[in-house]
Amino acid sequence: MPIAVVTVLLLVSAALVAISSDAGLAPPGLAGLDVQWLVLLAWLTAGSASAVLLCCRRRRATTGLVVAGALLIGSGALVGPPRFSDDSARYAWDGIVSGAGISPYAHPPVAAELSGLRPLWLFPAVAIGSDGQPACPTPGSRLTRQTPDGAPLCTMINRPEVPTIYPPVAQGWFAAVRALLPREAPWWPMQVAGLLTSLGVTAALIA
């Protein structure tokens, strides 16, 4: 019975994580619910599963459920782009720049020198609003200006006017994740890398 309860709780937690990543997956009862509540519910169900596991002293079954839970909940986050932070846009961009043989510390994302590296998912097309001014219709994008010519530019990267702040070891990780992928590959490489890292840590803690 405890194993069945834990399995159900893990499935519910994974479903809540998936819904928090992509609101379009929400059933009618959860549609419109604030994403913070979804995350809280996911934590509560995962925590409840952990509590039941602590009471169930069957090591083999417990180990399998911990690994399965880590995989299920981590996979749930892959159904959509990150919603709580746009930092991964900078991670991906730094990896793309490094992969082109350019130091990510040399130029900010808005620099014209890097214009040939910009994928559309990180730099969506600029539109002209009803007032005749440039606008960024893509959700999550912000309007900035290319330097030095001042051309309007939309980007998903925060603080695009300044070079990266991430240290060399982090840059090595970003470059490694993006190394074998085309620039057009969007959010999922960093998400998958994060999931694999999480599973590795889980396995190390169990061993």
Residue ranges of each PLM-predicted region?
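Start-transfer (signal-anchor) and selected internal transmembrane alpha helices
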Residues: M1-A14, A18-V79
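Alpha-helical transmembrane signal-anchor/signal-peptide segments
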Residues: F84-I96
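Membrane-interface anchor segments at the N-terminal boundary of transmembrane helices
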Residues: G29-L40, P182-L199
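Interfacial juxtamembrane loops and adjacent helix segments
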Residues: S98-W187
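Short acidic, glycine/Ser/Thr-rich loop/turn "cap" segments at secondary-structure junctions
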Residues: I73-R83, L153-E161
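Alpha-helical transmembrane segments of multipass membrane proteins
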Residues: I73, A77, A170, S198-V201
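Transmembrane-helix motifs of polytopic, lipid-linked glycan transferases
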Residues: A46-C55, A176, W188-A207
